């Protein structure tokens, strides 16, 4: 039996960029499964993020801030070998069969995420936004895309995601690991030990790379976003 939610939820739909070009499909699938499992352990979800069709994956969260964090953790877990993009939607959803895995969604919130995924793919084709990997569409007050004015939370989210993706693009693999570490609660001493460098070196890398700014922005948005 289908279950409907009148309360808006955050739907995440992601896919692997250039998946057909990967020579080792088994490696890709294994890495993706591990990344999704790691994100599910770190961020509480209404619907755990799972592979749905092909190289797409989806999940649902009670809060937009949680969906934004989950998307980043998945991406950081997969970089640099595998890059991914994300559409985030906010609105009511319908789950046709809660027992089915992966769960099949429909409704304004799901279509908002689908539209956001299409939008980010199109925007990334332009030079000025080529590093964009995440977009957000709010469909909590209207079921159609139309020309409805963007809500303040949606504006905050889109602005932050655009800057966040640009910062991520300027990081190397070590900086990705360090950012993932601070987002998941690791101390600088723990990160230094894992990387085989000194704690002051970790501090310097986190500051210069923009990782601290990303973490702080997530903490602030967690307080104001639905």
What residue ranges belong to the model's regions?
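Short alpha-helical "packing" element that flanks the helix-turn-helix/winged-helix DNA-binding module
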Residues: 174-182, 191, 222
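Short, Lys/Arg-enriched C-terminal cap helix and immediately downstream tail that follows
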Residues: 210-225
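Linker/hinge segments immediately adjacent to helix-turn-helix/homeobox DNA-binding domains
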Residues: 107-170, 223-225
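Regulatory/sensor and coupling segments of signal-transduction and defense proteins
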Residues: 4, 159, 169, 184-185, ...
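Key DNA-contacting residues within the recognition helix of helix-turn-helix
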Residues: 203-207
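Short alpha-helical "recognition helix" segments of helix-turn-helix
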Residues: 188-195, 202
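DNA-contacting interfaces and partner/effector-binding or oligomerization modules
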Residues: 2-126
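Short amphipathic alpha-helical interaction segments
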Residues: 166, 170, 179, 183, ...
């Amino acid at each position: 039996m289908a279950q409907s939610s009148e309360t808006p939820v955050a739907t995440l739909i992601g896919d692997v960029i250039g998946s057909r070009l990967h020579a080792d499909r088994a490696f890709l699938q294994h890495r993706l499964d591990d990344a999704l499992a790691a994100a599910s352990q770190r961020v509480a979800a209404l619907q755990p993020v799972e592979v749905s069709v092909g190289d797409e994956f989806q999940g649902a969260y009670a809060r937009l801030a949680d969906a934004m964090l989950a998307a980043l953790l998945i991406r950081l877990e997969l970089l640099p070998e595998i890059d991914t993009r994300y559409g985030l939607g906010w609105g009511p959803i319908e789950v046709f069969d809660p027992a089915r895995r992966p769960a099949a969604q429909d409704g304004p919130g799901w279509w908002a995420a689908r539209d956001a995924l299409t939008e980010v793919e199109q925007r990334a084709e332009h030079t000025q936004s080529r590093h964009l990997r995440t977009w957000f569409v709010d469909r909590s007050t209207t079921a159609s895309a139309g020309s409805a004015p963007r809500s303040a939370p949606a504006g905050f989210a889109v602005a932050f995601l655009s800057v966040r993706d640009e910062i991520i693009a300027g990081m190397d693999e070590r900086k990705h690991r360090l950012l993932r570490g601070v987002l998941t609660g690791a101390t600088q001493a723990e990160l230094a030990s894992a990387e085989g460098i000194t704690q002051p070196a970790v501090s310097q890398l986190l500051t210069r790379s923009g990782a601290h700014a990303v973490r702080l922005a997530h903490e602030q948005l967690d307080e104001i976003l639905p």
